[in-house]
Amino acid sequence: MRESVRKVLVIGSGPIKIAEAAEFDYSGSQALKALKEEGIETILVNSNVATVQTSRKFADKLYMIPVTWWAVEKVIERERPDGIMVGFGGQTALNVGVDLYNKGILQKYGVKVLGTPIEGIERALSREKFRETMINVGLPVPPSLSARSEEEALEKARQIGYPVMVRVSFNLGGRGSIVAWNEEELKRDIGRALSQSYIHEVLIEKYLHHWIELEYEVMRDKYGNSAVIACIENLDPMGVHTGESTVISPCQTLDNKEFQDMRFMSMDVAKSIDLVGECNVQFALDPKGYNYYVIETNPRMSRSSALASKATGYPLAYVSAKLALGYSLYEVLNKVSGSTCACFEPSLDYVVIKIPRWDLDKFENVEISLASEMKSVGEVMSIGRSFEESLQKAVRMLDIGEPGVVGGKIYFSKMTKEDALKNLKMRRPYWFLYAAKAFKEGATIDEVYEVTGINKFFLNKIKALVEFYEILRKQRNIDKDTLLQAKKLGFSDLQLAKALGVKESDIRKLREKWNIEPKVKQIDTLAGEWPAVTNYLYLTYNGTEDDIEFSEAGNKLLIIGAGGFRIGVSVEFDWSVVSLLDSSLKYFNDIAILNYNPETVSTDWDIARKLYFDEISVERVLDLIRKEKFTYVATFTGGQIGNNISKKLEEEGIRLLGTSGRSIDTAEDREKFSKLLDKLGIKQPEWISARSLEEVKEFISKVGYPVLIRPSYVLSGAAMKIVNNDLELMEYLKRATEVSPEHPVVISKYLNDAIEAEIDAAGDGKGVYGVVIEHVEEAGVHSGDATMSIPYRKLSSNVVNKMKENVHMIVRELEIKGPFNVQFVIKNNEPYIIELNLRASRSMPFSSKVVSKNIISLALDGILNGFGVDEFIELKPKSWGVKSPQFSWAQLKGAYPFLGPEMKSTGEAASLGTDFYDALLKSWLSSSPNKIPNKEGIALVYGTTNVEYLKIAAKNLIDYGITVYTLSEASIGIEEKSINDIIELIKNRKVEIVVTDGYLKHIDYEVRRIAVDYNIPIILNGRLGAEVTRAFSHPNVTYYEISEYGAGI
C-alpha cells in the first residue's frame, strides 16, 4: 500500500568529496524516477551542479543551495512537501534529516520521513546505540566502548587493551578513524577523531588484525520482508577501509554455513534498525576459526550499494525508493530482468571486481599507506568469467599506465623481493602489482600472506598469472591454444605483444586469423536461470557464443565514457555522456555507451539502449565495432581517456563524431599548439620546448623566473608546476617528462598577478556558441580549484571581444566540431591563450545550467547540422552563477593544503543569485566544512602573498564582528599570535575560520594541517578570502528555485 504523499523533498549529497561521490547522483536519480512514476511532485535540494540529477529531466523543482538543515528548512517553508527522503544523499543527507527531526522542523511542517525512521538511523549511526542494539538482539560485536572526550577514550582503551580501532559516529569514509597500537598513538590522534564526529562520539574497539571483511547488501520493506542482494568480499583485511579495498562479488572463500549465517544476521541487523529500503551490513570473520562479528551498518544507499547494484543488475536505488513509498518487495518489479519481482535474490554467473583509484601523488606530505580512513577518489568495476580475467581488466581500467597485473612498470622495475614485500607491508595502493613483483622475484605465498593478510586463494591466482607470463616471455612465440588461454586469463593484446616482442597489431591479426574474439554476455540478475532480456552487457573470452543478436541498422553511435573518477575527471563528464545520449536519440537509430564506472548514471540499466560495462581501450572499441558496425564513435565525453585513444582510432579507420583526431593531437601536444597560436598571431606566454637542459637555461636567462612547466596529454594539471629557481626546475622537469615521454614538454613564462578566464563553447567548424567564465583567484590556481563566476566582473568588453575573436580563429583553423574549452590569462588588458581542450570540460555542466543552454546538445547540433553562422555568439545568463571547489583535505591525512597549477579539489558546488555575493556565499557554504563563522570565535588571517587582499579579508571580518589575529611568522600587520598559540586555540575549538595564501609549508604546516583535521573552514587564496568575507555581511541572500533565476536545463 503506497504512502499518500503528493509532494516529496529529496535531499542530495552536495559536492563530491572523498567517500561521498557520484554514487549519490546515480541513487538520487533513480529515486526521483521512481517517485515520478507514481505521479508524485518532486523537489530536489542539491548544490552539485555537475550531476545529472540537477538537470530538469529528473526533479520538478531544483534548489541549488547548501545541503544543510537551515537551508533545507527554507525550502520546506516555501514548498510545504508532505514527505522527505534522506537515504539517497549519503551521510550529508542523513545528517540533515536527523537535524531537521531533532530540531522539530519536520514535525512543525508535517513532513513525513519516508523509508527508515530517524530513530532507526540514529541506532545505526551512533556507535554506542548500534553496539547496544546488536547486544540486545543477540548479535556478536567486537569488545568495544564509546567515548565522548579524549580522557574517556584513553580510559576505555586501557580497559579493552591495545591495539584498538577508533571508529567515528555519524561520519563517512572512516574520517578521523585510526588504529592505535599504544597509548601514545591514541593520544596523538584522538582529538582529530572526535572533531570529525557529527555528535562528538567515537567507539573504542578491539582491533581485529588481519580478519576478513565482508559486506551484505540488504533490502527490507515495511512489512518485514527481506532479501539479500549481494555478498561482497574484501580482499584487503580489516584495518583497510572498505572504500580502499579491492573487493569481489560473489564471495569466493566462504563455505555455505558461513555465507548463510551472515546472510541471516544481516537481515537481523536490518530488522533491528527498522530498516525500510536498503542497508549495507559489514562483518569481520576470523580466518583461523569459525568466529565473526557485526561491525557496522549504513542505513542508506552507499558506495557499496551502488557497486552491488551494478555488479548484480539489481536496481537497488529504484527499489529502495519504491519501498520507502510503502510498497512490499513482492509488489515491485525488477525492471532490469523485466520478469521477476524485487524479492528475487540475484544469482551471478560471472565475477565482479572493484578496485579504488588514488591520486596521492598530487599531495605533499600525505600518508601513502592505506588504512581505516578512505583516501581514494574513484573506483573501477570489471566483469569477467574468471578471477584472473576480471582482475586484469580492472587493473587496465585504473588508467595508471599498467597493462594488467603483470608486464608493466612495477613488474619490470629494479625492485627486489625485499622491496616488494616492504611495499606490501606498508599497504601502498595497488598491492596486487607489488604481489606480482614479489612472486616474480621469488617470494612464496606464505611470505606475501604474512605481510598482507590477503587470503591465499587470491594470492595463488596472482602467482599463477606470473608463472604463465614468464613462460610466455621465454617462448617468444605463441600458438592458437596458448593465445586463447591467455585471453581467458585477461591478458590484453598489448600485454602479450610486450611479452613476445611484437606489435599489438600482430596479436590482433593472429586473433583474427584464428577467430579468437570476445563474446558479448548479458547481466540479467538471474544467471540465465529465468527468461530475461537485458541491455546490460560485458565482453569475455570465457564464453562460446554471444548472448545477443547485433542490429544491422545503420546510423549507430558508440559513446565513450570517462571511466573511473580521479582528480580532474569526475561526475561532470558523466553529465556530458548522458547529455550526449539524450541529444542523440533524434539523430541515431542505435546508441550504446562504453564505460566501467559503477558510481555513475551513465552505467545505469535504463539510460542507454545498450550499456557495455567494459574497459575503454583501442582494442575493446575495435572489438565492439567489429560486432556492432557503429557508424560513429564519440570520444569527446570521455575526458582524457577519450582524447588519448581518438588519434589511434582514427588511424584504424574509425569515424569520430566531431573534431578530427589530428586536430585533437594538435591541441593536446603543447608544442604543436603553441606553434599554431604563433601562426595565427594569437598571444600566448613566451615558451620553449624542453628538449635539452641548455635550451631551458637559455630561455630562462631571457624571460626570467617564474616559469610554468606543462607536459602534454594530461588532465587536471598532472605534473604541472610553477618553478621559481634552478633547483625547483631540475626537480620538476624530471617529474614532468616522466608523465608523457613521447611528447615534448613546454616551458612557458608564468604571468604574475594576472586574471584567469575561460570559454566553454560548441563549434561547427566555422561558427561558435560560447560562455565566458571569470575566475575569482588569480592565474596560477588550477581552473579545477578556482572559484568561477558567470557573468564576468573584471574583464573589459575590449578584452572579451579579443578572446572571442581568438576562439573563432582557432575554430576555423582546426575545424572544431563539438564541445571545447579555451583558457586565458589576462595581463595589462591583453588576453593570452594558455590551453585548448577539444572535449567536454569540467565546467560545462555549470556554464550550461547557468545560461540555460546545454552546450553538449548544442555541439551535437553543430556537428550534424551546422549552426549556419560564421561568428562567435555569446551565451549570457539572466542571473549570477558561482561555482566553488570542494576539497577533501581532512581525508588526506598529513597532506599540506595549498593551491597551485596542479588540481587538488575532488568536487564542486554552485549556486545562483541575484548578484555576485548572493551566489558566492551560498556556493562557498555548499562546500564542506564551510560555515558562517560564529562572532564569538576567532578568525586567523595571514600570509606573504596577496597581502593586500588578506588585509581586506581581515578588515571585512573585523567589520563582521569577529576577533581577528594574524600569525606572527607571516604577519599582515594586525594583532599577532604565535604558531603554538594558534594551535592551542584550534585544539580548544576557538578558531572559526582560517584565511591564508601561498606556499608556506616551512612556516605553517602545523597550522593548516590541524585546521583541516579539526574541521575548520580554510580559504587558501587571499583574493577569494576578500570576496567571501565580504559576502558574510551580504544583506540579501536568496533561496529560490533555479527557474526563478532564469537558469537550468
UniProtKB/Swiss-Prot annotation:
Q: Which family does it belong to?
A: Belongs to the CarB family.
The portions of this protein that span the membrane are: none
In terms of Pfam families, this protein maps to: CPSase_L_D2 (PF02786), CPSase_L_D3 (PF02787)
Example GO CC term: the record gives: cytoplasm
What Gene3D superfamilies does the record tag this protein with? 3.40.50.20, ATP-grasp fold, A domain, ATP-grasp fold, B domain, Carbamoyl-phosphate synthetase, large subunit oligomerisation domain
Sites binding Mn(2+) 2 sit at 296, 298
Q: What is known of its domains?
A: The large subunit is composed of 2 ATP-grasp domains that are involved in binding the 2 ATP molecules needed for carbamoyl phosphate synthesis. The N-terminal ATP-grasp domain (referred to as the carboxyphosphate synthetic component) catalyzes the ATP-dependent phosphorylation of hydrogencarbonate to carboxyphosphate and the subsequent nucleophilic attack by ammonia to form a carbamate intermediate.
Q: Which gene encodes it?
A: carB
Instruction: Write out the residues that bind Mn(2+) 1.
Output: 282, 296
List the residue ranges of the region (Allosteric domain): 931-1049
Annotated residues that bind Mg(2+) 4 are located at 835, 837
Which organism's genome codes for this protein? Answer: Sulfurisphaera tokodaii (strain DSM 16993 / JCM 10545 / NBRC 100140 / 7) (Sulfolobus tokodaii)
Region annotation (Carboxyphosphate synthetic domain) maps to 1-399
Residues binding Mg(2+) 1? 282, 296
Ranges for domain ATP-grasp come to: 131-325, 674-864
What's the name of the protein?
Answer: Carbamoyl phosphate synthase large chain
Entry binding sites for Mn(2+) 3: 823, 835
**Which GO terms fall under biological process for this protein?**
'de novo' UMP biosynthetic process; glutamine metabolic process; L-arginine biosynthetic process
**NCBIfam families in alphabetical order:** CPSaseII_lrg, PRK05294.1, PRK12815.1
Q: How does it assemble?
A: Composed of two chains; the small (or glutamine) chain promotes the hydrolysis of glutamine to ammonia, which is used by the large (or ammonia) chain to synthesize carbamoyl phosphate. Tetramer of heterodimers (alpha,beta)4.
Q: In which pathway does it act?
A: Amino-acid biosynthesis; L-arginine biosynthesis; carbamoyl phosphate from bicarbonate: step 1/1; Pyrimidine metabolism; UMP biosynthesis via de novo pathway; (S)-dihydroorotate from bicarbonate: step 1/3
Annotated residues that bind Mg(2+) 2 are located at: 296, 298
